[in-house]
């Protein structure tokens, strides 16, 4: 039998109990977006721009402004978050720093006006009205069901974590100074009007957040007003600032962000150490020692640089045609921290694997494929000195929505299973998505076939048809 993946490394063979999910009421306004699939959702989100056009001409390249005059869409956007939502959430308990920030841009610098401890709506509204401060609410998808629904679909579409923030800014005020982010940004204008100015990046596709001074950013490449129902996209590194015009009502906009630490460089950092570890087992040259006293040198000698360059070329040659990379940290981090599947009602029926256990003659099919990753890695059993490779299945079905993207220091649990490497072909059969009979799985014995199906079924990863 495979073993459950536990964060402590204690991997016991015990079945899981399907979790129950408590949901709040859906917004009264019916969604005007298409949630049939991740692809159809993204297509409807950026409509009327075609998806092919977006990725060919705008993604990671330049901003896209979609201005709409659509009262139905504007009403739907308004339902995503409002001051009344903030008031309701304050009654339940929100805290400065973790849930909400109060800030204002003064002379090109961000001034934080947070108090300590729990945030009360009357105090927030006082700072909003009297100090002209912006209220920033972190990760509202933890509480607003429709945002959970939206961001879960986007995480499936991009295969990357998707966070969000709501910015509520009074008239004649600006919350943040000019800056750029390390994420791809989608702005949805929910209420009021916001004056945006975008500038050419000083660091294209930036890998970190930074504030830029006014004398460095030059003149805007884009200068426009965003109104309810409008959508704005810009790549990471795009310098931007926004203010609510004087004489108008307050502005509320939603920032949806993704692709943080999701570059080719991040992929190489994640993959290369495990790959070198694997190849060193086969290549004695990689296991030979470095020159004496090399670590004491102030500069790297030319012959050492040539040696390392040669090793890198060898690794590149070995990488060609290799199907399995000993890389799991990015996959594991994504699944561990992403949103669970969105469910209508309380979700208990969908999460229940059902009463029928999978037997040899049963046909099974994978479900929640976008919420599961399969990776090969060393056995984490502390008693396995040989460090044999095993197959890990990680999933997000039991992730806690209220913990999504809030950066708590506590180590959250990751859910999944562990199988012998001999099971990888059978798992790939299931992963193709087509229904398959249990007895047709590529395993040596009927017992192994049933045990594999039963383990996946116990985690609600497969359906018995």
From Swiss-Prot:
It is found in: Nucleus; Nucleus, Nucleolus. GO terms for molecular function: identical protein binding; metal ion binding; peptidyl-histidine dioxygenase activity; transcription corepressor activity. Its main location: nucleus. It catalyses: L-histidyl-[ribosomal protein uL15] + 2-oxoglutarate + O2 = (3S)-3-hydroxy-L-histidyl-[ribosomal protein uL15] + succinate + CO2; L-histidyl-[protein] + 2-oxoglutarate + O2 = (3S)-3-hydroxy-L-histidyl-[protein] + succinate + CO2. InterPro entries: JmjC_dom, NO66-like, ROXA-like_wH. Residues 139-271 form the JmjC domain. One of its GO terms (biological process) is regulation of cell population proliferation. The keyword Membrane does not apply. Fe cation binds at residues 179, 181, 240. One of its GO terms (cellular component) is transcription regulator complex. The modification Phosphoserine is found at residue 309. Keywords: Dioxygenase, Iron, Metal-binding, Nucleus, Oxidoreductase, Phosphoprotein, Ribosome biogenesis, Transcription, Transcription regulation. Its EC number is 1.14.11.79. Predominantly expressed in testis. Expressed at high levels in spleen, thymus, and colon, but barely detectable in brain, skeletal muscle, and seminal vesicle (at protein level). Pfam families: JmjC_2 (PF08007), ROXA-like_wH (PF20514). Binds 1 Fe(2+) ion per subunit. Induction: Up-regulated in experimentally-induced cryptorchid testis. Its cofactor is Fe(2+). Belongs to the ROX family. MINA53 subfamily. Oxygenase that can act as both a histone lysine demethylase and a ribosomal histidine hydroxylase. Is involved in the demethylation of trimethylated 'Lys-9' on histone H3 (H3K9me3), leading to an increase in ribosomal RNA expression. Also catalyzes the hydroxylation of 60S ribosomal protein L27a on 'His-39'. May play an important role in cell growth and survival. May be involved in ribosome biogenesis, most likely during the assembly process of pre-ribosomal particles. This is Ribosomal oxygenase 2. It comes from Mus musculus (Mouse). The gene is Riox2.
